[in-house]
């Protein structure tokens, strides 16, 4: 069936978002420290405790998205929303549908074995996460002799 749309005003030479709104949700894999082996391979360093402090996502021309930090063992659930608005920017106007490029950093403050980090969005604006990373504290419990 054909899709028809109309606009309440003239949209000539204006940016317009057209598309279907859908729910995006993904859970990231467990974060580990990687170490190179003598034969050129890579293994996870899991002999200690990795305390994740912060996580961040680099985004490009992106709209609103949510970052979830969930720990089912401790029953802790936090949601951090990137609103697409940065205070102090001159482009931040009410009613404007701007896209932003930058870095969104949020706290985790949990053990890497217990926490699950996920990203979700259900807005019609584009979601374009190009990379991510984390800061943490690693304490090795034992060492080879």
Regions found by a protein language model. Give the residues of each.
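Beta-sandwich interaction modules
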Residues: 9-10, 86-128, 132-135
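Exposed low-complexity, polar/acidic, P/S/T/G-rich flexible segments that act as propeptides
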Residues: 23-67, 122-145
């Amino acid at each position: 069936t054909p899709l028809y749309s109309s606009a309440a005003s003239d949209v000539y030479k204006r940016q317009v978002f057209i598309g279907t709104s859908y729910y995006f949700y993904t859970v990231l894999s467990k974060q580990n420290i990687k170490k190179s082996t003598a034969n050129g391979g890579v293994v996870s360093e899991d002999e200690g405790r990795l305390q994740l402090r912060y996580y961040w996502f680099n985004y490009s021309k992106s709209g609103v998205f949510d970052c979830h930090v969930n720990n089912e063992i401790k029953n802790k659930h936090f949601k951090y929303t990137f609103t697409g608005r940065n205070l102090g920017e001159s482009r931040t106007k009410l009613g404007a549908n701007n896209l932003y490029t930058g870095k969104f950093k949020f706290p985790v403050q949990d053990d890497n074995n217990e926490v699950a980090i996920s990203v979700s969005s259900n807005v019609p604006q584009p979601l374009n996460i190009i990379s991510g990373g984390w800061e943490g504290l690693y304490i090795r419990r034992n060492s080879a002799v």
